[in-house]
Swiss-Prot record:
One of the Pfam families matching this protein, by short name: Ribosomal_L16
Protein's UniProt keywords contain Ribonucleoprotein: yes
Domain of life of the native organism: Bacteria
Keyword hit for Transcription: no
Protein name as annotated: Large ribosomal subunit protein uL16
Keywords linked to the UniProt accession: Ribonucleoprotein, Ribosomal protein, RNA-binding, rRNA-binding, tRNA-binding
PROSITE patterns linked to this entry: RIBOSOMAL_L16_2
Length: 136
């Protein structure tokens, strides 16, 4: 599962996702990409599940770039614990994704395979996405 090696702080605020993406909003590496169309928090397991779906459909051809990384700890209190007594322990890691952000890029496969692979990957994510090409 994806998570940072070291962090400055153990816990983070919940925060809100405002505006659209300015960084990582254009294709930099591959020819085809999956672009986020809504603001959402994506967890590490979902990113990994989407990556596995991508690589399996591509049958290890081409190359995949993951443009997001879960760097925010999400804490959770144990089951059946009363309110109060501080914030819970970090449970998993998440990434705040703004609309317009590139999630995955792929290269070295045909457009039909790329479209199908990215469609399968998008099914693993809790967000509305869009297939885009570098040279449209």
């Amino acid at each position: 599962m994806l998570q940072p090696v070291r962090t400055k702080y153990r816990k983070a605020h919940k925060g809100r996702i405002h505006g659209t993406a300015t960084r990582a909003s254009k294709i930099n590496y591959g020819s085809f990409a999956l672009k986020a169309m809504a603001p959402e928090r994506i967890i590490g397991k979902q990113i990994e599940a989407a990556r596995v779906a991508l690589t399996r459909h591509m049958k290890r051809q081409g190359r995949v770039w993951t443009r997001i990384f879960p760097n925010i700890p999400v804490s959770k209190k144990p089951v059946e614990v009363r309110m109060g007594k501080g914030k819970g322990a970090p449970e998993y890691w998440a990434c705040r994704v703004k609309p317009g952000r590139i999630l995955f890029e792929i290269d070295g496969v045909s457009e039909t395979i790329a479209k199908e692979a990215l469609y399968k990957a998008s099914a693993k994510l809790p967000i509305k996405t869009k297939f885009i090409k570098r040279f449209a």
